[in-house]
From Swiss-Prot:
Family, similarity comment: Belongs to the peptidase T1B family. HslV subfamily.
Subunit structure: A double ring-shaped homohexamer of HslV is capped on each side by a ring-shaped HslU homohexamer. The assembly of the HslU/HslV complex is dependent on binding of ATP.
Species this protein is from: Wigglesworthia glossinidia brevipalpis
Keywords from the UniProt entry: Allosteric enzyme, Cytoplasm, Hydrolase, Metal-binding, Protease, Sodium, Threonine protease
Protein name: ATP-dependent protease subunit HslV
Length: 180
């Protein structure tokens, strides 16, 4: 699996992920880029699960964004519905963490579209470790979103066998948000 973390703070939205790809219990590659920008760089997304499956889902989500003219939540719900009902898509094994300037979501193959209660999302095998670290850092430090994501990924990479310390990041800035 992997670790993907998303944090919102002071108008900055960052999604970061580790780079490890495994096949069974063997590390196949250390520098996979699991985060991407979509829809003219207005959406950021990260995946946990099968790489080919995730790229398929990225493409489908971007098509939904185009069809629905960038309406983020509507596009996520429509993707989840298709994922659940289409016989071929149902076989895809991945989770997506996606964000635009206003909203962060987790999209699953069970037709779940989940908006977190807090400003943190973490998915993948290292997700629980990263989420715990990110929440603690968000609540108890003044670190920026990117530094929180980086430190959370480092902690997860130290604990989770299926995560490493090669990180990639994507960031959005909410221009209308007052940065304190």
């Amino acid at each position: 699996m992997t670790t993907i973390v998303s944090v919102r703070r002071n108008g900055h939205i960052v999604i970061g992920g580790d780079g490890q790809a495994t096949l069974g219990n063997t590390i196949m590659k250390n520098n996979v880029k699991k985060v991407r920008t979509l829809y003219n760089d207005t959406v950021i997304a990260g995946f946990a699960g099968g790489t080919a499956d995730a790229f398929t889902l990225f493409e489908l989500f971007e098509k939904k964004l185009q069809i629905h003219q960038g309406r983020f939540v509507k596009s996520a719900v429509e993707l989840a519905k298709d994922w659940r009902t289409d016989r071929m898509l149902r076989r895809l094994e991945a989770l997506l963490a996606v964000a635009d300037k206003n909203t962060s979501l987790i999209i699953t193959g069970n037709a779940d579209v989940i908006q977190p209660e807090s400003d943190v999302i973490a998915i993948g095998s290292g997700g629980p470790y990263a989420q715990s670290a990110a929440r603690a850092l968000l609540e108890n430090t003044d670190l920026c979103a990117r530094d929180i994501v980086r430190k959370s990924l480092q902690i997860s990479g130290d604990i989770c066998l299926y995560s490493n310390h090669f990180f990639s990041f994507e960031e959005l800035i909410h221009e209308n948000k007052d940065i304190i």
